[in-house]
Amino acid sequence: MSAITRHGDALVIRLYIQPKASRDQIVGLHGDELKVAITAPPVDGQANAHLTKFLAKQFRVAKSLVVIEKGELGRHKQIRITHPQHIPADVAEFIE
C-alpha cells in the first residue's frame, strides 16, 4: 500500500510521527508510511494539534480540512487532507 493516495478531491496520507524533534519537517518514506518530524511533545494532544497545524501550512489549507482518521494516540496515523491547494515537492513524488 502506498503512503499517499488520492480519494477524489482529498489526499489520504499514512504517517509515522517523530515527536520532540529539533524542527518540523517532512523527512521522507519510513517503510510504507511518510515520516514527519514535529517539535511538539506527545502530551495531552499537543503533537496532534501541532501536526495538524504543520500539515495545513504545508498543503495551504485550513486546519479544519486536515483530519486525523486513525491513530489519535499512536505514532502511526492516517490523515485526510481535503482540497489541498499546494502539494510540497517532497510529498508529490509519493502520490499514487
From Swiss-Prot:
Taxonomic placement: Bacteria, Pseudomonadati, Pseudomonadota, Gammaproteobacteria, Enterobacterales
GO cellular component: cytoplasm
InterPro entries attached to this UniProt entry: DUF167, YggU-like_sf
Family: Belongs to the UPF0235 family.
Domain of life per record: Bacteria
Annotated protein name in UniProt: UPF0235 protein ECA3630
Pfam families xrefs: DUF167 (PF02594)
HAMAP family to which the protein is assigned, alphabetical: UPF0235 (MF_00634)
Classification via SUPFAM superfamilies: YggU-like (SSF69786)
